[in-house]
Amino acid sequence: TVWFNAVLRGDVHFIKIGNRVNIQDGSCLHTLYGKAPIIIGDDVTVGHNVTLHGCEVKSGALIGMGSTILDHAVVGHGAIVAAGALVLKNTVIGDGELWGGVPARFIKKVDPEQAKELNVGYAQHYVMYSDWYRRSDAHPNTHITAPHRKNMTKLPNGNTSTREIMRKF
């Protein structure tokens, strides 16, 4: 899903987006003229106000709010880029690694099960949000009733909240 005010500029190279990807509000994806497309794998969350520029984000990754990933950078499978991070050009973030800061640096390896639970969980939540939003009883600029908790999509561990997962970090 591509949310409000997100911009995908594939004007000078292509953008390829996998399944169950959510690109949240205000994010900007732009390619590098003739040199660097944007490639995003499956089950990826791109947080609010993220800038992706000519980079690759592999399946199961989570890109935190307000972060920037520059040309030719690669974010590995199940990796996490912390909110507000600046990933410099040509940086390679390994599978299952947590990076953060300005400029972004390696922080730690994340347990693969925890990363999958968190990253895929967020992706699944946004699939649910898009289904809910498209329903006939949800309309913009009117009173919208949120889905009842009992009807929410379950995370892989059976939880309906990511709070428990975040406590593990």
Write out the residue ranges for each language-model feature:
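Glycine-rich hexapeptide-repeat left-handed beta-helix
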Residues: 11, 17-19, 25-40, 48-166
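Short proline/glycine- and basic residue-enriched helix-capping loop/turn segments at helix->loop/beta transitions
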Residues: 45
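N-terminal first-folded block
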Residues: 1, 5-9, 35
